[in-house]
Amino acid sequence: MARYIGPKCKLARREGTDLFLKSARRSLDSKCKIDSAPGQHGAKKPRLSDYGLQLREKQKIRRIYGVLERQFRRYFAEADRRKGSTGELLLQLLESRLDNVVYRMGFGSTRAEARQLVSHKAIVVNGQVVNIPSFQVKAGDVVSVREKAKKQVRIQEALGLATQIGLPGWVSVDADKLEGVFKNMPDRSELTGDINEQLVVEFYSK
């Protein structure tokens, strides 16, 4: 399955919520009719069955983190294998992806931009260049922008905006060094409440 490269607004309208696919500078809230379904006239959304709700939630979370279906299924299998709340563990696995950590630290204005920085070898983890977006970051890992990439205007602008909005509590960032520490896995209470991961658990448990 190829990665979706079409209009971001269309996806947000389909899921009925901002998927954070654009930077905070260009928030979808004011530009997309999120309450309307995709299409010229925004057809009325049909009432969904339990299965439909579970499927939509899975698709929403998958799109927020920019993960393909096969990858997402593997993350769920790994979360289900571990001890603890499967839904919360799933979110933690997604949150600890390198591209997501780069985004959370403010080095990329969107997860897609952060993924590009990683793929283009602009990111260093514990002193080593890592170009795999799905690389799993561990508590205590130091993530920084590679020296030759530090002058990129988009990185400076993204970090400036992220600092204004506020960085999450599970990362710390030195803006002067363009370096951050992944302090710990986030608790469920620290993540957005607009996600119902239990529906995903129910979807895969059928």
UniProtKB/Swiss-Prot annotation:
InterPro entries: Ribosomal_uS4, Ribosomal_uS4_bac-type, Ribosomal_uS4_CS, Ribosomal_uS4_N, S4_RNA-bd, S4_RNA-bd_sf. Residues 96-157 form the S4 RNA-binding domain. Gene3D superfamilies: Ribosomal Protein S4 Delta 41, Chain A, domain 1 (1.10.1050.10), RNA-binding S4 domain (3.10.290.10). Keywords: Ribonucleoprotein, Ribosomal protein, RNA-binding, rRNA-binding. One of its GO terms (biological process) is translation. GO terms for cellular component: small ribosomal subunit. Pfam families: Ribosomal_S4 (PF00163), S4 (PF01479). The keyword Membrane does not apply. The keyword rRNA-binding applies. It comes from the Bacteria. CDD domains: S4. Part of the 30S ribosomal subunit. Contacts protein S5. The interaction surface between S4 and S5 is involved in control of translational fidelity. Belongs to the universal ribosomal protein uS4 family. PANTHER family: 30S 40S RIBOSOMAL PROTEIN, SMALL RIBOSOMAL SUBUNIT PROTEIN US4M. This is Small ribosomal subunit protein uS4. It comes from Neisseria meningitidis serogroup B (strain ATCC BAA-335 / MC58).
